[in-house]
Amino acid sequence: MIRVLCVAAAAVFTTGLATAKDVTVGVSWSNFQEERWKTDEAAIKAQLEKNGDKYISADAAGSAEKQLADIDGLLSKGAKVLIVLAMDKDAILPAVNKAAKQKIPVIAYDRLIEAPGVFYITFDNVEVGRMQARAVLKAQPKGNYVMIKGSPTDPNANFLRGGQQEIIDAAGKKGDLKIVGDEYTDGCKPE
């Protein structure tokens, strides 16, 4: 979380907003139903309030289309910095481009948005994938495995899967396990 705030500060600094007070930061959540985002939101709000800045947000509720409208709404409410947890890395691009034209810094939070000038902050997804694979292998070291990767529109699914594969390959070479399925989950939702 601290890194997110450091990147937000860097974005503000690079746009000349560093000395401004009462900067409005808009946060676009892809799916606020996950408990993690509520924890992160509390930390972001607290830091912004401490700095004398304003927090506004919108929840896309799992809809890439709604997220585009949400970002328009955040911009119309005066957001001078955007933090975006993208529902779909490609569908979000029109909103990111609109913000860029308005010289609004965009921070891709947790999910990569491949667009010029977008800051990206996340944890080490590959290492998390390795950790997941180690835990699964410890619990069930032999047998048939099905790999469920998450949404194909979330780049983290591939990063996690890459880390898992590094660990699983070694066990597979010993003949202890076999991958019998490897699928994305379209529209992956927390419920």
What are these regions (language model features)?
Residues 18-191:
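A residue-level marker of the well-folded mature domains of exported/periplasmic proteins
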Residues 1-19:
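Gram-negative bacterial Sec-dependent N-terminal signal peptides
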